Regions:
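Basic, low-complexity terminal or inter-domain segments flanking catalytic cores
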Residues: 2-13, 27-333
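Eukaryotic nuclear/nucleolar intrinsically disordered, charge-dense low-complexity regions
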Residues: 21-24
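Single conserved hydrophobic/aromatic residue that forms the stacking wall/gate
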Residues: 332, 338-341
């Protein structure tokens, strides 16, 4: 969304097209890992990418190094973390269809290929430096890092994106830092004062909102409940974009088509206020986690299906009646004539 300014639903349509043209594997998946069966044949996928010019050299490099042969023993392969389908990867086939792809679709395909090939290259290495300097009783702190080895970063950099510039430091400066010891006296060449202000959190765009929905458990303080919802989140990979689309259709949020920035509408804020002051728990991810825990209890026989259903029915009835009793008056508000459910 941030890179191409397209919505999650448009992204899914593009990846669906790539799938139908046999360029990538099944797109409607939450998985971030591969299956053991796929790992055994992964060399075919890599070898096929030698026919895709933007990543041909990196595919050849992965084949030459042979790192793919041990992929089954890495964190990228885990059958237990796969429910229906493994992660989206390029098939290494279907290149005849590349000519029929729109420019954006071709770029999305390149991203998938580069992300896939990156796992067969070493990690990027940085050197972190933290210094505490003392002068006349005042302490000054300096923290920075510099790149030692690019590793996979040279593979993941897209051909169509501006490369992120890493801070440049002279070799002399780096060598001098390596020799600095506690208690050393350093001469100050210059001092520069910079003034700044803290910035508010950035607004969600459609892409970052999808990721937040996927990782909703991060907002839960209770460790047991946080673990309960881990890997679940709000919705699924096949429904999250639909949830956002429905919120927009109901006029609860506004989605800027050019920037993909998501903004709550006046109606959306009203709905939020009503829920906040009546059923506050619905706004918290730990409620969803507790429901998931209850469902797990049913599955494990710790609680009967009837008992769980009764608890849910009582909860919904109680708080629905509470909402009905709230006196609310908003003027100058035009409500949508039809809400999607």
């Amino acid at each position: 969304s941030a890179l191409f300014k397209i919505s999650p639903s448009d992204t899914l349509k593009i990846v669906q097209e790539l799938y139908e043209k046999k360029l990538v594997t099944y797109p409607r998946t939450d998985a971030r890992v591969l299956s053991t069966a796929v790992a055994k044949e992964i060399g075919r996928n890599i070898s096929g990418l030698k026919n895709f010019q933007p990543v041909a050299a990196w595919a050849q490099g992965a084949m030459d190094s042979g790192t793919y042969k041990g992929i089954a023993k890495t964190k990228y392969v885990n059958d237990k973390q796969i429910t229906d389908h493994y992660a989206i990867i390029p098939t290494g086939q279907g290149f005849g269809a590349l000519k029929s792809l729109a420019p954006t679709a071709l770029k999305v395909y390149e991203i998938i290929c580069r992300r896939f090939l990156s796992i067969f290259y070493p990690a990027a290495e940085y050197q972190k430096v933290a210094m505490t300097l003392t002068k006349n009783g005042e302490k000054l702190f300096a923290n920075f890092k510099y790149l030692i080895s690019e590793g996979y970063l040279k593979v993941s950099a897209n051909s169509f994106s501006k490369k992120k510039d890493e801070p440049k430091y002279s070799q002399e400066f780096i060598e001098r830092l390596a020799n600095v010891k506690k208690g050393d006296k350093l001469s100050v060449q210059s001092i520069e004062i910079k003034e700044g202000e803290t910035s508010p959190p950035k607004r969600y765009n459609s892409g970052s909102l999808i990721l937040t929905m996927e990782n909703a458990g991060q907002f839960i303080e209770d460790e047991d409940l946080r673990e309960q919802i881990k890997g679940a989140g709000i919705g699924t990979s096949a429904t999250r974009d639909g949830i956002i689309t429905k919120l927009e259709a109901n006029k609860y949020i506004s989605l800027n088509k050019k920037t993909q920035i998501v903004t709550p509408t006046f109606l959306g804020e009203i709905i939020y206020d009503i829920v906040y002051y009546s059923i506050n728990g619905l706004l918290r991810a730990d409620l969803t986690a507790s429901w998931e825990k209850g469902l797990e209890g049913v599955a494990e026989g710790q609680i009967s299906k009837e008992e769980y259903t009764q608890k849910m029915t009582t909860y919904v009835t109680q708080y629905t009646n509470r909402v009905k009793q709230i006196p609310v008056s908003y003027t100058h508000l035009t409500l949508p004539t039809k809400l999607e459910v």
